[in-house]
Amino acid sequence: MKEMVGGCCVCSDERGWAENPLVYCDGHACSVAVHQACYGIVQVPTGPWFCRKCESQERAARVRCELCPHKDGALKRTDNGGWAHVVCALYIPEVQFANVLTMEPIVLQYVPHDRFNKTCYICEEQGRESKAASGACMTCNRHGCRQAFHVTCAQMAGLLCEEEVLEVDNVKYCGYCKYHFSKMKTSRHSSGGGGGGAGGGGGSMGGGGSGFISGRRSRSASPSTQQEKHPTHHERGQKKSRKDKERLKQKHKKRPESPPSILTPPVVPTADKVSSSASSSSHHEASTQETSESSRESKGKKSSSHSLSHKGKKLSSGKGVSSFTSASSSSSSSSSSSGGPFQPAVSSLQSSPDFSAFPKLEQPEEDKYSKPTAPAPSAPPSPSAPEPPKADLFEQKVVFSGFGPIMRFSTTTSSSGRARAPSPGDYKSPHVTGSGASAGTHKRMPALSATPVPADETPETGLKEKKHKASKRSRHGPGRPKGSRNKEGTGGPAAPSLPSAQLAGFTATAASPFSGGSLVSSGLGGLSSRTFGPSGSLPSLSLESPLLGAGIYTSNKDPISHSGGMLRAVCSTPLSSSLLGPPGTSALPRLSRSPFTSTLPSSSASISTTQVFSLAGSTFSLPSTHIFGTPMGAVNPLLSQAESSHTEPDLEDCSFRCRGTSPQESLSSMSPISSLPALFDQTASAPCGGGQLDPAAPGTTNMEQLLEKQGDGEAGVNIVEMLKALHALQKENQRLQEQILSLTAKKERLQILNVQLSVPFPALPAALPAANGPVPGPYGLPPQAGSSDSLSTSKSPPGKSSLGLDNSLSTSSEDPHSGCPSRSSSSLSFHSTPPPLPLLQQSPATLPLALPGAPAPLPPQPQNGLGRAPGAAGLGAMPMAEGLLGGLAGSGGLPLNGLLGGLNGAAAPNPASLSQAGGAPTLQLPGCLNSLTEQQRHLLQQQEQQLQQLQQLLASPQLTPEHQTVVYQMIQQIQQKRELQRLQMAGGSQLPMASLLAGSSTPLLSAGTPGLLPTASAPPLLPAGALVAPSLGNNTSLMAAAAAAAAVAAAGGPPVLTAQTNPFLSLSGAEGSGGGPKGGTADKGASANQEKG
């Protein structure tokens, strides 16, 4: 190793630690010195070590940073094959590390083009105008300042800093223009004691509990307080990759969410980057935590201090980051005490998004995962208990809100204690629930104390990561694993080892779902804070912190944020639509469920939800907290409200229905987990689609009202309302389930009936007599039973079954009754079968129809025995009618027979054929006939039989002159149809077959009705049937049957279905209803869709 000359090229810290040594490149004429964590060195070699530039052996002239004009320094490969400084990647928010652990390659694809268009004012001041426009510039982290400069230029000018947002976990990588940097220095000096103390405390806490990162630990061990920034730098090296990513992501989010963006962006980017190296989360977490710390220091200053300064100044602390942190702390604590932490915590708010993010992660790490698991459950049972912890959490949060460097430690320890006292009142609700346990909060704090730096830093990093990642994920896709980001956010499994693991596991789960999940939650927090402005941001971030701290990990928070977000149009919508909607939606629901499951048990849903909603500004955090804590129940109701509004629309959404239904069922049980899934489902649904969100609008409105009420301290009422909404949602779910069951049962019954009806009935020889009288029929059903009744019954089912019944009744592909062209053979056949019985029962008029329709011999019989059975049964009284019906059924296909038979009472046997034809009439006809040619053959045979039967009828003395006329016309029509059928048969297609069948049946029908009405038009036929029935009396039944047959033929595209459908109409018409034209054959298909009359 070379002798140590100068500091780290990344963090500028000259110190090295055993856990995070300063490594020097052994390349020729290379002066690169970096901390292991700052450069992403997984393992420092015992022999010579070479930086990536020297390792690549590329000519120095070809190695230049794509983000700045400088060629020297610690460079790494970029995703596009170029090179970039690690420090440039850390300080430019949109730059990410594909692998946070190794901090390479550097991902530049998300850097907006306008960054490359900015010019460096430092280069211009120093006379390097030619280089001023090269690379990508960062902007002064001071809110409102538009000065742009290269990262390396600012580094050389000493304008970069790492602001520790949450003492331990995260570091904000901040850079300021000279003017604002000097102001930041003065403000830091003024609040330096508090900030430094807090930072130092945080550092030592991080060191103690920070098995996380040697750098961190050593930093905390080493004069982290006195040299917070240096250890920060050192850790920043490690955390930087993470922080860098977090910062980038945070900045990325920063843009969307402006208030938290300032604070959160650094954190998120860091977390993002940490997340990027999720795989090496542990090491990176160590390094990231250090980096986080330093990054937080620097970025916190940059983002936190900058944004906080901006906001903090706006709020109350215009001082430097330190003072800001202090101000934030005091503001938070005072806010907490005052009960307006959200509003008074504007300054804390600014830091809050950042810090909030920290607490968020930190809490989940230390408290939430260690404690919330246990405390959370207790929290759910006792909302008030969780509330005090919430206050603590919030205090933490507030403290976290305060700048990490200043407030970080104090926040965790003294600040949190101080803020806690006031916090409980103000944030109590949100935080307690969020924490899910006062112990959790406190413990978290202590845990932070023990390993606060890692935990706090980690949470912040995680949060930043989350926020940035969420935004990035939502924008760019799933991105890095949430879990790793969370882990890293956790600051590595080291400090919050257990919490970290839990958080990692939990958060991993949550994170994954978060795809914007944790990000979303943090992002939401950020968004909400930005959206809501200083007061909004603070609460939002605070809530965020509590969310994580609340033992709700991001995942929960995210869903809630969704819910809440939906409620909160700005916060939730942006997040849910951009983050959750795209990548996180599905993941969120899925993972969220598991998180919910695990979180719900630990915490009560009601409080969480309530608190979530209570905090209008902090919808996200609170929801998360609540969700994880007791509030789950409350959230559920809230969600259920949203869900109930969504329920019907959402049910249409498969994913929602599947998720929502079972979760809703669970909700029925009122299990917190169930509630959570429901909440998640709704949340997911809402983010997923605008439609879902719209459905949730009513719920959202209520939820928003609930949030407002909760914000006003009416959490209890909100809980009740949410529970009511949940209850209503559960009831709706039960009702729908019952409906499904009933429909299923009906379907089964119809199927059974169909099978029964498929069995051919004995043919009734006395067709005419039967026609004259009610059809004692094969079914022996009373003629009074109306086919319309059967239709209505089949139609009565609201579900598709009813449709199927209608279809089956109408046998034709287009259900005359339903007017629906649905063609479900099984459904049709089933349903058609039951209707036929009622039809048979319907009346003698029906029989007459059947009789005229059944004149065809039993050609249908060959077709499943339905044709002949329908002929015999349907025509029961009238063999000729049977033949006709059989002919129709045969020609139309079994469906016709079945329907006609069923309708006429002669169709008793037909149902079987119907069922066969029931499917798509087209398919079924072939099924019944076994082939188009076979069907055609049957049609021809049936037509011949029908002609014979009609001739017999004409010869029969029973026929009156009117009947004879009708029969004669029918014979003519049958002959005409034969020609049409032959032509159609030539087509050989099933549909043509159906139309042929329809055609064949039509001639019969038209033959029956021609005397009264033109056979050509189905409507005339039906009216004719009606007229015929009255005029013929008993004979009318024959005429009616003929008319019905004609109507049927006219009605259905596939004759079989058509015939069946029409028979109902015809039957009613014969009885005097004058079914009106149902439709025509396939040829007369238009009429099929006409009114039933």
From Swiss-Prot:
| Cross-referenced InterPro entries | AF10/AF17_PHD (IPR049781), EPHD (IPR034732), Histone_Mod_Regulator (IPR050701), Zinc_finger_PHD-type_CS (IPR019786), Znf_FYVE_PHD (IPR011011), Znf_PHD (IPR001965), Znf_PHD-finger (IPR019787), Znf_RING/FYVE/PHD (IPR013083)
Q: Which SUPFAM superfamilies match?
A: FYVE/PHD zinc finger
UniProt KW Phosphoprotein keyword: yes
Zinc finger motifs (C2HC pre-PHD-type), residue ranges: 62-95
An individual GO BP term: chromatin organization
Q: Where is the composition biased (Low complexity)?
A: 317-340, 410-425, 787-796, 818-832, 839-853
Give residue spans, biased composition: Basic and acidic residues: 282-300
Q: Compositionally biased, Gly residues: which spans?
A: 191-212
Q: Which residues carry this modification: Phosphothreonine?
A: T451
Which UniProt key words apply to this protein? Chromosomal rearrangement, Metal-binding, Nucleus, Phosphoprotein, Proto-oncogene, Repeat, Zinc, Zinc-finger
Which Gene Ontology molecular function entries are recorded, alphabetically? histone binding; nucleosome binding; zinc ion binding
Mind telling me which Pfam families this protein's record contains? PHD_2 (PF13831), zf-HC5HC2H_2 (PF13832)
Residue ranges of the region described as Disordered: 185-500, 775-871, 1060-1093
Q: Where are the zinc fingers (PHD-type)?
A: 5-57, 118-181
Residue ranges under compositional bias (Basic residues)? 231-255, 301-316, 465-484
- GO cellular component annotations of the record: nucleus
SMART domains in UniProt: PHD
Q: Where is the composition biased (Polar residues)?
A: 345-354, 804-813
- Site note KMT2A/MLL1 fusion point (in acute myeloid leukemia patient) applies to G551
Gene3D superfamilies in the cross-refs: Zinc/RING finger domain, C3HC4 (zinc finger) (3.30.40.10)
- Assembly notes: Interacts with histone H3; interaction is necessary for MLLT6 binding to nucleosomes; interaction is inhibited by histone H3 'Lys-27' methylations (H3K27me1, H3K27me2 and H3K27me3).
Q: What is this protein called?
A: Protein AF-17
Q: Which organism is it from?
A: Homo sapiens (Human)
